[in-house]
Amino acid sequence: MRLIPLNTAEQVGKWAARHIVNRINAFKPTADRPFVLGLPTGGTPLTAYKALVEMHKAGEVSFKHVVTFNMDEYVGLPKEHPESYYSFMHRNFFDHVDIPAENINLLNGNAPDIDAECRQYEEKIRSYGKIHLFMGGVGNDGHIAFNEPASSLASRTRIKTLTHDTRVANSRFFDGDVNQVPKYALTVGVGTLLDAEEVMILVLGHQKAQALQAAVEGNVNHMWTISCLQLHPKAVVVCDEPATMELKVKTLKYFNELEAENIKGL
């Protein structure tokens, strides 16, 4: 596992965006051989999306031959609702870059057959071979996507009941009213994430410090979904300084020295 320790949330977003752009450009995608990118929602990736849009407008990257799969979607929330992940992605990213509409894949939380929707999502991912890079965030309790504590590390795309803590955390997007936050969501599984060629998780803020400590210094544990990254051959965690407060000094020193060339100039 790589840990990229930076100072600010803005630096995390810019580093992540640059990494994505470098991966896409090195891949040299075509219509017949697209780059497959997994994407998250929430507050954490906003700086990364902003940086990606800026780099696209500067002519540094095209998303014309990029196929995207989003991590999750609320169940029962109309896709036109401002807090649906469909709306979030179009508002913050898709509407500002040159990605074709047919290359965008989002789970349908209003599908008449939820199980079939989840099964077809997995099948579509497999039809591309694999996701080349999956970017994600993490919850205070260590969940990735909506794989809440005690999720199977072999799980696939499915419906999940959201914990009260997750709904409270997300209520900031619903005028602070937890009762407006859906109780269920569709989410890719831990196994889906682990199948990706590379997984990059962004960790911001002191409230995520315990989750980061569990990922880097703890044991693999289904109560801390983020710890599954230890099983992945190409996992990258990018964090700001407040998120490192639970790490041992020697751990942080080790990764600072290891990644010195990759964080220089930020």
UniProtKB/Swiss-Prot annotation:
One Gene Ontology MF term: glucosamine-6-phosphate deaminase activity
UniProt site (Part of the allosteric site): 151, 158, 160-161, 254
InterPro entries: Glc/Gal-6P_isomerase, Glucosamine6P_isomerase, Glucosamine6P_isomerase_CS, NagB/RpiA_transferase-like
EC number: 3.5.99.6
An annotated GO BP: N-acetylglucosamine catabolic process
Pfam families membership: Glucosamine_iso
Gene Ontology CC annotations of this record: cytoplasm
Pathway info: Amino-sugar metabolism; N-acetylneuraminate degradation; D-fructose 6-phosphate from N-acetylneuraminate: step 5/5
Active site per UniProt: 72 (proton acceptor), 141 (for ring-opening step), 143 (proton acceptor), 148 (for ring-opening step)
Regulation affecting activity: Allosterically activated by N-acetylglucosamine 6-phosphate (GlcNAc6P).
Catalytic activity: alpha-D-glucosamine 6-phosphate + H2O = beta-D-fructose 6-phosphate + NH4(+)
Keywords carried by this UniProt record: Allosteric enzyme, Carbohydrate metabolism, Hydrolase
Function: Catalyzes the reversible isomerization-deamination of glucosamine 6-phosphate (GlcN6P) to form fructose 6-phosphate (Fru6P) and ammonium ion.
Subunit structure: Homohexamer.
Family: Belongs to the glucosamine/galactosamine-6-phosphate isomerase family. NagB subfamily.
Protein known as: Glucosamine-6-phosphate deaminase
